[in-house]
C-alpha cells in the first residue's frame, strides 16, 4: 500500500429527527391529549485510532463521510431512534484540523482513542412537551437541528519510539533492517527510502533470547541541507520526527560526521526547535570501512557535541547489541511522553452571536400612510429557535413570544426604542411588539 500522511476529507453528521405533533386517538375518546414523541439524535462522525495501520492511503477512495439522521418522533409518545454514528479509523498519531478555522479538533496518540469531529444534530421535542395550564393542546412541535458539517485536514505524524535521522545513504535502512523485522529497500544511492518505514526491535538477553520487551523504530527519509525550507523530501517527512520519543542521528564515518551532525540539528531547529529537546544519541555507522584508530578519533570529536556516541556497523553487526540495549535504557516512559507531546485540542464550543437589533422603516404597502417601523433581530440564538419551529410558526407564536420575553428580548427592544405596534422581524418570523410595562 502506498504511504500517505496528509488527506483532506469532508464530514457531515446526521440531522436530528423532528418532534411529532400528534394527539391521542382512541375509540370513544373524541379529544385525546397531545402525545407527540421526541425525534432521535443525529449520528456523529468519530475519528478512531487503531493499530496495524500506518498510512491514510486506505481512506483515499472515500473522501466524504456521512452519519445517519435521527428518526422522527411519532404518536403515543414514541421517540425516534438515534442515528448511527460513523467511525473513521486512522493510524495512531493522526491529527485532525478544521480546514476553515485551522483549529486542532483531534489528536489521537493512543490505540483506541476516539474524538467526535462532527456532532450530530439534536432531536426535536414532541408537542407533549409544550403543554401548560393555559396551553393544553399545543399544535406545534420542535424540529431537529442540522448535523455539523466541516472540511477536515488529516495529518499523520507516525508515533515511533525511535526515529532514525540522517543524510541520504548514511545507512539508516540497513541499520533498521539489522535491528528489526522491517524489510526496507536498500541500495548504494541516495533517497532509496521515499516514505517512513517502521520496524519492531525486540529486546534480547546476553544469550540472544528474545525478551517480552520491544519498541518501534522509524526510518525517516533522508534529510538534506535546506529540508526545513522544503528542499529534497523536505517538509513532507520532517513532521514524523516530531512524534518520536528518541532520535538516533545516523552518521557515515567515511564522510564528515561532525559537520553533518551540526547540519542535521540546524535543519531540525529550523523546522521545530523543540525537536532538539528530545533524548538523542549518535550511531556512527560503517566503522568497518575505516581503521579503528580513525573511528575512535571521530567518536571523540562527536562526543564534544554533547551527545552519547556509539560505533556500529549495520553491515557487519558490530555494536548492534550495545545500541539496542542503550535505546531500551534511554527510552522515556510512554505515558509521560504521550501526555507531554499530544497537541492541545481546542474545545468545539458553539457560541451564540451577540444580539444585534437594527431599525428600519418600510414604505406602506399601498403607498399611503406612515412608514412601517421594523426591528430586525440578529444573533442571541433567537434565529436558531425560530428555525426549530419554522413548520409551526403560526401555532407556536404565543409560545415563542413568551419564551423571547423570558430571555430578555423585549427588554432589549424597549431599550433600543421600540414602540407598541412596531413590527419585530426574526428571520422569516414577524410579530407585533407589545409593551406590557407601559
Curated annotation (Swiss-Prot):
NCBIfam families associated with the record: Obg_CgtA, Obg_CgtA_exten, PRK12296.1, PRK12297.1, PRK12299.1, small_GTP
GO cellular component assignments: cytoplasm
Binding residue positions for Mg(2+) = 173, 193
- UniProt keyword Coiled coil present: no
Name of the protein this chain belongs to: GTPase Obg
Predominant subcellular localization, coarse grouping:
cytoplasm
Q: Name what cofactor the protein needs.
A: Mg(2+)
Recorded GO molecular functions are:
ATP binding; GTP binding; GTPase activity; magnesium ion binding
Q: Which UniProt keywords apply?
A: ATP-binding, Cytoplasm, GTP-binding, Hydrolase, Magnesium, Metal-binding, Nucleotide-binding
Q: What Pfam families is this protein classified in? A: DUF1967, GTP1_OBG, MMR_HSR1
Amino acid at each position: 500500500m502506498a504511504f500517505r500522511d496528509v488527506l483532506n476529507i469532508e464530514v457531515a453528521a446526521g440531522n436530528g429527527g423532528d418532534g411529532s405533533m400528534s394527539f391521542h386517538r382512541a375509540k370513544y375518546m373524541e379529544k385525546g391529549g397531545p402525545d407527540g414523541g421526541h425525534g432521535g439524535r443525529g449520528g456523529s462522525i468519530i475519528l478512531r485510532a487503531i493499530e496495524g495501520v500506518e498510512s491514510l492511503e486506505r481512506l483515499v477512495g472515500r473522501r466524504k463521510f456521512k452519519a445517519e439522521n435521527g428518526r422522527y418522533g411519532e404518536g403515543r409518545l414514541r421517540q425516534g431512534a438515534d442515528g448511527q454514528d460513523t467511525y473513521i479509523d486512522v493510524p495512531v498519531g493522526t491529527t485532525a484540523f478544521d480546514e476553515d478555522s485551522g483549529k486542532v479538533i483531534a489528536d489521537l496518540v493512543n490505540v483506541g482513542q476516539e474524538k467526535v469531529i462532527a456532532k450530530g444534530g439534536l432531536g426535536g421535542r414532541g408537542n407533549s412537551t409544550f403543554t401548560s395550564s393555559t396551553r393544553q393542546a399545543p399544535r406545534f412541535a420542535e424540529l431537529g437541528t442540522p448535523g455539523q458539517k466541516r472540511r477536515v485536514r488529516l495529518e499523520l505524524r507516525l508515533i515511533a519510539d525511535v526515529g532514525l535521522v540522517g543524510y541520504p545513504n548514511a545507512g539508516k535502512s540497513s541499520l533498521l533492517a539489522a535491528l528489526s523485522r522491517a524489510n526496507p529497500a536498500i541500495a548504494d544511492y541516495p533517497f532509496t527510502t521515499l516514505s517512513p518505514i517502521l520496524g519492531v526491535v525486540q529486546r534480547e538477553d546476553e544469550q540472544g533470547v528474545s525478551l517480552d520487551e520491544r519498541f518501534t523504530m522509524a526510518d525517516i527519509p533522508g534529510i538534506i541541507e535546506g529540508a526545513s525550507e522544503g528542499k529534497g523530501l523536505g517538509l513532507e517527512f520532517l513532521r514524523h520526527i516530531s512524534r518520536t520519543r528518541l532520535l538516533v542521528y545516523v552518521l557515515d564515518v567515511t564522510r564528515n560526521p561532525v559537520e553533518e551532525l551540526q547540519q542535521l540539528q540546524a535543519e531540525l531547529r529550523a523546522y521545530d526547535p523543540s525537536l532538539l529537546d528530545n533524548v538523542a544519541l549518535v550511531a556512527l555507522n560503517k566503522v568497518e570501512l575505516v581503521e579503528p584508530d580513525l573511528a575512535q578519533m571521530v567518536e571523540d570529536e562527536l562526543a564534544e557535541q554533547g551527545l552519547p556516541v556509539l560505533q556500529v556497523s549495520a553491515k557487519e553487526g558490530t555494536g548492534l547489541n550495545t545500541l539496542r540495549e542503550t535505546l531500551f535504557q534511554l527510552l522515556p516512559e510512554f505515558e509521560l511522553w504521550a501526555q507531554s507531546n499530544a497537541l492541545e485540542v481546542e474545545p468545539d464550543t458553539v457560541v451564540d452571536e451577540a444580539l444585534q437589533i437594527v431599525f428600519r422603516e418600510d414604505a406602506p404597502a399601498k403607498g399611503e400612510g406612515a412608514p412601517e417601523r421594523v426591528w430586525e433581530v440578529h444573533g442571541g440564538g433567537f434565529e436558531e429557535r425560530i428555525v426549530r419551529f419554522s413548520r409551526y410558526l403560526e401555532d407556536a407564536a404565543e409560545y415563542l413570544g413568551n419564551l423571547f420575553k423570558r430571555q430578555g428580548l423585549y427588554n432589549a427592544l424597549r431599550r433600543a426604542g421600540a414602540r407598541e405596534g412596531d413590527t419585530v422581524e426574526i428571520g422569516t418570523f414577524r410579530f407585533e411588539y407589545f409593551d406590557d410595562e407601559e
